[in-house]
């Protein structure tokens, strides 16, 4: 049986060259399944707003949403290390709010750590939260909460100036005390440079194979989100047609008087 994961495991894994496997989860049953498979880290992402709630982006997600879904994940008692996203406006306005909301995700939600988007601009915020003994994961590159400033979901760090800015962001996140950093939507060569430069693990999503670990959205790898599939996603299953078939069969059996049978009732 897998032992409870801690931040010490991820430091060791980077040092030993063992890749870190991360998936998102937002509920009890999915968490139980992936934890039984040996997933290293679970991210309760604000991506829940897109793949579960149907928003166009993550901006509408609230602290209440994140606490609710983090609690659902933690009820599965995962051995994986659970990180919860701080949603938009929960940490950007002032340090007091950032500390309070990070604390709520740990105290009320049950998360072991929080994730914050940004680099140099959130260095002070990361330090303020880690000073409360709350572990922090950074997130640089394509940061979904900044989509309007970026002009949409576009690859970041392509030019030399942008690449150097992202390197500065990565170093700032490490300097501030984060124990890991997500690299999203950046060139593979830049991700390799950052990974080699940092002493903390890098978790890639659309950043190539040279990161210390990888994260994907569970709905994407299961083929549950058909309207949009990013280039960096690999679908390990196509569950949407299977779910559709099951629903169609149920409807047909109810309409045809086939279900329920006598064995499905009580005497």
From Swiss-Prot:
Indicate whether Transferase appears among the record's keywords: yes
Q: Which Pfam family is one of this chain's hits? A: Pantoate_transf
Q: Where does 3-methyl-2-oxobutanoate bind?
A: 46-47, 85, 115
Q: How is the cofactor bound?
A: Binds 1 Mg(2+) ion per subunit.
What's one GO BP annotation on this UniProt entry? pantothenate biosynthetic process
Give residues annotated as binding Mg(2+). 46, 85, 117
Subcellular location(s) of the protein: Cytoplasm
- Which CDD domains does the UniProt record give? KPHMT-like
Pathway membership: Cofactor biosynthesis; (R)-pantothenate biosynthesis; (R)-pantoate from 3-methyl-2-oxobutanoate: step 1/2
Q: Which reaction does it catalyse?
A: 3-methyl-2-oxobutanoate + (6R)-5,10-methylene-5,6,7,8-tetrahydrofolate + H2O = 2-dehydropantoate + (6S)-5,6,7,8-tetrahydrofolate
Q: Where is the active site?
A: 184 (proton acceptor)
UniProt keyword list: Cytoplasm, Magnesium, Metal-binding, Pantothenate biosynthesis, Transferase
* GO function terms (MF aspect): 3-methyl-2-oxobutanoate hydroxymethyltransferase activity; magnesium ion binding
Q: Name one GO cellular component term.
A: cytoplasm
Cofactor(s) annotated in UniProt: Mg(2+)
Which Enzyme Commission number(s) are listed?
Answer: 2.1.2.11
Q: What is its main location?
A: cytoplasm
Function text: Catalyzes the reversible reaction in which hydroxymethyl group from 5,10-methylenetetrahydrofolate is transferred onto alpha-ketoisovalerate to form ketopantoate.
The family classification in the record reads: Belongs to the PanB family.
Subunit details: Homodecamer; pentamer of dimers.
Q: What is this protein called?
A: 3-methyl-2-oxobutanoate hydroxymethyltransferase
Q: Which organism is it from?
A: Citrifermentans bemidjiense (strain ATCC BAA-1014 / DSM 16622 / JCM 12645 / Bem)
């Amino acid at each position: 049986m897998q032992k409870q994961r801690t931040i010490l495991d991820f430091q060791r894994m980077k040092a030993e060259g063992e890749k870190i496997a991360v998936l998102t989860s937002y509920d009890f049953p999915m968490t139980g399944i992936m934890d039984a498979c040996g997933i290293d880290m679970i991210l309760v992402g604000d991506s829940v707003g897109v793949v579960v709630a149907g928003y166009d982006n993550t901006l509408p997600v609230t602290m209440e949403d994140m606490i609710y879904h983090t609690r659902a994940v933690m009820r599965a008692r995962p051995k994986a290390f659970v990180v919860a996203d701080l949603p938009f406006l929960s940490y950007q306005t002032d340090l007091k709010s950032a500390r309070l909301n990070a604390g709520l995700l740990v105290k009320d939600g049950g998360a072991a750590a929080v994730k914050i988007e940004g680099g140099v601009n959130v260095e002070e915020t990361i330090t303020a939260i880690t000073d409360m003994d709350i572990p922090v994961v950074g997130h640089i590159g394509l940061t979904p909460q900044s989509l309007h400033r970026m002009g949409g979901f576009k690859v970041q760090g392509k030019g030399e100036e942008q690449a150097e800015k992202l390197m500065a962001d990565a170093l700032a996140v490490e300097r501030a005390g984060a124990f890991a950093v997500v690299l999203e939507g950046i060139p593979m060569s830049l991700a390799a440079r950052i990974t080699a430069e940092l002493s903390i693990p890098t978790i890639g999503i659309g950043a190539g194979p040279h990161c210390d670990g990888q994260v994907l959205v569970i709905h994407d790898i299961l083929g549950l989100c058909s309207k949009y599939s990013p280039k960096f996603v690999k679908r390990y299953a196509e569950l949407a047609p299977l779910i559709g078939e099951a629903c169609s069969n149920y409807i047909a059996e109810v309409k045809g008087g086939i279900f329920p049978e006598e064995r499905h009732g009580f005497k």
